[in-house]
Swiss-Prot record:
PROSITE patterns (alphabetical): SAICAR_SYNTHETASE_1, SAICAR_SYNTHETASE_2
Alphabetical UniProt keywords: ATP-binding, Ligase, Nucleotide-binding, Purine biosynthesis
Family: Belongs to the SAICAR synthetase family.
Species whose genome carries this gene: Yersinia pestis
Signal peptide, first to last residue: none
Gene3D superfamilies recorded: ATP-grasp fold, B domain, Phosphorylase Kinase, domain 1
Name by which UniProt lists this protein: Phosphoribosylaminoimidazole-succinocarboxamide synthase
Domain of life: Bacteria
Amino acid sequence: MQKLAELYRGKAKTVYTTENPDLLVLEFRNDTSALDGQRIEQFDRKGMVNNKFNHFIMTKLEEAGIPTQMERLLSDTEVLVKKLEMIPVECVIRNRAAGSLVKRLGIEEGLSLNPPLFDLFLKNDAMHDPMVNESYCKTFGWATEAQLARMKELSYLANDVLSKLFDDAGLILVDFKLEFGLFNGEVVLGDEFSPDGSRLWDKKTLNKMDKDRYRQSLGGLIEAYEEVAHRIGVKLD
């Protein structure tokens, strides 16, 4: 499948059209960003690692009955995906307290959350992705009640599948974000799942193995990503 025109360039991925109007090429770049894109650096191998990591995770989720946009790997940094009508809201599942939740509520980082929390955020970098709720989504037309219910259902199902996957690999799935879109009217998981959009801690040491290593200037970003990939069985080379 040949990529044609650039359709959209995000903070770490570029989307291209193809000769099939229902399919796109998603290219993972080496860019890494923080502070809503205000801080950007390049890291060798990152695009390749995230592409193969994402393909591996999406395959696992498909096997669990979660519809995804994934079609097939095209290269080390490119994947063929369905063209979705994206819903402009991020779904976040939280199994442990971290990030904005800790700042917002003043609770201890790492606090176990049972049952896991489900949050919604409007995708808007200029507004720093404000937290919203289902009422906002329905009033402003971002998603219908049925779509929201399906997004929530699929997010919790993904959490069940991935929490076990990472737990078996000696890792804690602290939290993660998912984005959904519509394909022929069906709610489908889009975008990506990688250490860029999730928090993963080592079970024994609680070392951070995700993009917090970049956000908090801890170093060893790609080494951590590759270690996580290796533990869960992603073939990188």
